[in-house]
Amino acid sequence: MNRPIVLLVEDETSVVAFIQSALERYGYCVEAAASGAQALEMLRDRSYSGVISDMRTPGGVDGAGVWSWIAGHRPELLRKLIFITGDIVNEETAATLRRTCAPFIEKPFRVHQLISTLEQVLGQRQ
């Protein structure tokens, strides 16, 4: 059986290492993009089972920009995107979460929260 491939959009290397290690322990393959712009390049070139994106990333394309691109180019991934954020009180972040209806996890989070949410959006149980 092929392992699900998840695109992780996160610029903090310690968070990337934490999430990648956790997801790999649960049988996922993780490819990381350090910016929203890099994520869009990767989404153009490869298929993913799901996407986990930080709301705030450098390079001019944030989590909302990744969501918008997916909506226009890879709509099959819209319901398979999870936002992670440390800033839900920010009005722009809150507005994006309301507009997209995408599931989100607030930093800091526990591994079981991430795995449970990922299993829900991918429609599988580990």
Name these PLM-found stretches:
Residues 10:
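Conserved acidic carboxylate
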Residues 41, 62-77:
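Short amphipathic alpha-helix used as the core "switch/output" element in two-component signaling
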Residues 109-119:
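C-terminal output helix
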